[in-house]
A protein has these predicted regions:
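Short linear motifs in exposed loops
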Residues: 16, 42-43, 138-139
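C-terminal hydrophobic helical "lid"/dimerization subdomain
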Residues: 116-129
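Hydrophobic, well-ordered secondary-structure elements that form the walls
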Residues: 97, 115, 132
Length: 145
């Protein structure tokens, strides 16, 4: 499936997903391109974030390097050079829930509103596919301005 979407401030995104991409086993990549550069992260190299500034040299940012944000260090559970995987990502959410229950909120938890937006996006993708790929509004009515 190919999903095109618009976010706030005119940002355009594209999501491609397939369960039958020949030669890829659980491949999951995220790429972000903007006016000043681009980032790429791939599940096959989970400890690296590739950053390329416009007009500059590509840089590989490794897990555990000095200068990373506190959340990047806090959410890393295993030693450098060892991938963490999906189960530990979910465990981080559980830890954030426990912190929230103790009153140590970081505003990192998903909200009911973000869940509703996610469900609306899936429903819009299905409706668009049934309509031959027509552009479909994915914003729930209560969030429309």
């Amino acid at each position: 499936a190919m999903v095109n979407f618009r976010m706030s401030k005119g940002i355009v995104g594209r999501l491609w997903t397939s369960s039958v991409a020949i030669g890829r086993q659980h491949g999951f990549d995220i790429q972000v391109f903007g006016e000043t550069g681009g980032f790429r992260w791939a599940s096959e190299q989970p400890n690296q974030l590739i950053y390329t500034p416009v007009g500059g040299r590509t840089q590989i940012i490794e897990k555990g390097e000095a200068g990373l944000y506190e959340d990047a260090r806090r959410l890393s559970r295993v030693a450098i050079a060892h991938p963490e995987g999906f189960p530990l990502a979910v465990a981080n959410i559980y830890c954030d829930i426990a912190d929230s229950i103790r009153g140590e909120t970081r505003d990192a938890l998903p909200t009911a509103a973000s869940g509703l937006r996610s469900i609306a996006a899936v429903h819009a993708a299905v409706a668009s596919a049934k309509a031959g790929g027509a552009w479909t509004n994915a914003v729930p009515p209560m969030f429309r301005s």
